[in-house]
Amino acid sequence: MYTTISTDAPGVTLINVFTVAPDRQDDLVAALDRATAEVFVDLPGFRSANIHASLDGVRVVNYAQWASEDGFTAMLKRDDVQAHMKEIMTIADAYEPRLFAVRAVHNVEHRP
């Protein structure tokens, strides 16, 4: 499933901002990419993930969509997920995960 940003789409969005040393940014992106490909894509409720690296090298953002808050919460309790997060936290200095709901969307193709 592709990432769809819409106020009509059910589900929740995880925006997780990681702080990382510039020389470890690529390592963090690779670890998040690997965890997504190996674990998250097969979990119930997972919809999509997009990993962004800041141009200054000190942040990585994981923008992920889940079918529901319950599905997201269930994922956090899994041993395989916790193992990947443990690895990720050996690379990242800090992280700030938050769940969001889409409230407004604007784009060139769909101007009012």
Language-model features: locations:
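Glycine-rich beta-strand-turn "strand-cap" elements at beta-sheet edges
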Residues: M1-V12, T19, N50-V58, K86-P112
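A general boundary/transition motif marking the beginning of the first structured unit of a protein
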Residues: T4, L28, T73-L76
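Serine/threonine-rich low-complexity intrinsically disordered regions
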Residues: S6, A21-R24, L43, R78
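Short, well-ordered beta-strand segments in beta-rich or mixed alpha/beta enzyme
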Residues: V12-T19, S48-R78
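Short, surface-exposed ligand-recognition loops at beta-strand->loop->(often short) alpha-helix junctions
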Residues: T19-L32
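Residues that cap or initiate secondary-structure elements
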Residues: P22-R24, D70, R103
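An amphipathic, aromatic/His-enriched active-site/gating alpha helix that lines ligand/cofactor pockets
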Residues: R34-R47, Q65-L99
